[in-house]
Amino acid sequence: MKRRPTSKAWLQEHVNDEFVKRAQRDGYRARAAYKLLEIDDKDQLIKPGMTIVDLGSAPGSWSQVAVQRLAGQGRVIALDILEMPPIPGVEFIQGDFREEEILLVLEKSLNGKPVDLVIADMAPNISGISDVDQARAAYLVELALEFSREWLKPGGNFLVKVFVGSGFDEIVMAMRDSFEKVVTRKPKASRDRSSEVYLLGLKRRNA
C-alpha cells in the first residue's frame, strides 16, 4: 500500500478529479460509485430481485449504485460501524458485522431470504506505515470473505477491495477455495498510484 500524497497535494488532486466532479454532478456520495458501476457494467453482478449486502457501506455510494440498479426490485442491506445518512430503498444497520448482536439484526432482517451478492469497498484507517496498513487491509478482506462464506447462497457472488502487497496471493487462494472463479478488476476510477484492486469471487461453492 502506497503512502497518500501530502494533504495539500491530495486536496488539489481531489478538487480536479474527473470522478469527484462526476459524483457531485450525478448525486453520488463518493467517487467510488464509478468503480462499482464499471465493474457491474462488465460483470453484470446486480440484477433486479437480488438481496445485496454492502459491508463497510459508509458514506454510501456503493449502496446508491446497488439500489439504483435493482430498480425497485430487490433489497440492499448496508452495514457499517460509522453513521450513514439514509438512502431511499437501503436498509442500514449500524454496528460491527463481527458482533453477534449485529448479525442477529441482519438475520432477522433477511427473514430466511438468501444473500445473492456481498460487496465490500472497505479500507483501514491509514497510519502511513506500509506494513501495518497492508496487514490491516488484509484483515478487513479476511473478515469480509468469512462473512460471505457464512451468508452468501451457493452460487452467489462476492466483490471486495484488496490492496496488492504482502498477503495478496494468500487472499486470492482463499477466495479460490470458496468460489468457482476469481477475477481481478482495476476500474478506471481507481487512481493509478493506488495499489487497490477488486477481487470478484463468482459462484460460491457449496459448503
Swiss-Prot record:
Pfam families tied to this protein: FtsJ (PF01728)
Primary residence: cytoplasm
GO MF term list: rRNA (uridine-2'-O-)-methyltransferase activity
Enzyme class: transferase
EC number: 2.1.1.166
Catalysed reaction, written as an equation: uridine(2552) in 23S rRNA + S-adenosyl-L-methionine = 2'-O-methyluridine(2552) in 23S rRNA + S-adenosyl-L-homocysteine + H(+)
Binding site for S-adenosyl-L-methionine: G60, W62, D80, D96, D121
Active site residues according to the UniProt entry: K161
Localization of this protein: Cytoplasm
GO cellular component, one term: cytoplasm
InterPro entries, per database record: RNA_methyltr_RlmE (IPR050082), RNA_MeTrfase_FtsJ_dom (IPR002877), rRNA-MeTfrase_E (IPR015507), SAM-dependent_MTases_sf (IPR029063)
Statement: the UniProt record of this protein carries the keyword Transferase: yes
Keywords noted in UniProt: Cytoplasm, Methyltransferase, rRNA processing, S-adenosyl-L-methionine, Transferase
HAMAP family: RNA_methyltr_E
Primary role: Specifically methylates the uridine in position 2552 of 23S rRNA at the 2'-O position of the ribose in the fully assembled 50S ribosomal subunit.
Family: Belongs to the class I-like SAM-binding methyltransferase superfamily. RNA methyltransferase RlmE family.
Name the record gives this protein: Ribosomal RNA large subunit methyltransferase E
Organism the protein comes from: Methylobacillus flagellatus (strain ATCC 51484 / DSM 6875 / VKM B-1610 / KT)
